[in-house]
Amino acid sequence: MRRWLRLLVGLGCCWVTLAHAGNPYEDDDYYYYREDEPRQHGEPNYVAPPARQFRFPPLNNVSSYQASCVVKDGVLDAVWRVQGTFYPEKGIVARVGWSGRRGRKWGRLHAPECLVETTEAVFRLRQWVPTDLDHLTLHLVPCTKCKPMWCQPRYHIRYFSYGNSVDNLRRLHYEYRHLELGVVIAIQMAMVLLLGYVLARTVYRVSSAYYLRWHACVPQKCEKSLC
């Protein structure tokens, strides 16, 4: 019994470690970390630093973008200017998501206003945002004819908008790569299956012992009953 308890405790520790594992990727161009003055988490007013330009791989139709945002009294005023090749007649779907508390909380904001041209698209959003917001993500889907559930975002434009002090930013803002996320999910699923196997085996042994004790026909009992 002690061996199974130790195994369960070890599995729980591994689960907690994987759940809280962070991957800062400090050199990732997707994120812009503040380097001015430290700020407390959840302050209602925030003015983003000057917009920076980001480059995308040549395979994407989106080449670069600039972003700026201001959070005042808990209200976000953000603008994304995206350069690339667009087809206004085919339409484009834009979604804005937010994440906070090391990825433990996330959600989706209102759809931004879109002004799409052949070489540039401008997206504006003004909405109340939660106090524990860390960064925003603009998802662009270059079609509107297909159903939304089949329309997966093709371009992900991220812009840091709101957060903690500089020391916490490298710990808070991270993103799993697809391979690493797959490995983590596979390990967690394996631990779930192993835990289910251990529980099922324990239940089977307990039920078997109970049945043999109270319901099985033991030879001595059968002989006495026949007598």
From Swiss-Prot:
Glycosylation sites: 61
Membrane topology per record: Single-pass type I membrane protein
GO cellular component, one term: host cell endoplasmic reticulum membrane
Signal sequence, start to end: 1-21
GO terms (BP aspect): symbiont-mediated perturbation of host defense response
TM spans (from-to): 179-199
UniProt keyword list: Disulfide bond, Glycoprotein, Host endoplasmic reticulum, Host Golgi apparatus, Host membrane, Immunoglobulin domain, Membrane, Signal, Transmembrane, Transmembrane helix
Disulfide-linked positions: 69-151
Protein family: Belongs to the cytomegalovirus US6 family.
Protein name: Membrane glycoprotein US8
Origin organism lineage: Viruses, Duplodnaviria, Heunggongvirae, Peploviricota, Herviviricetes
Gene: US8
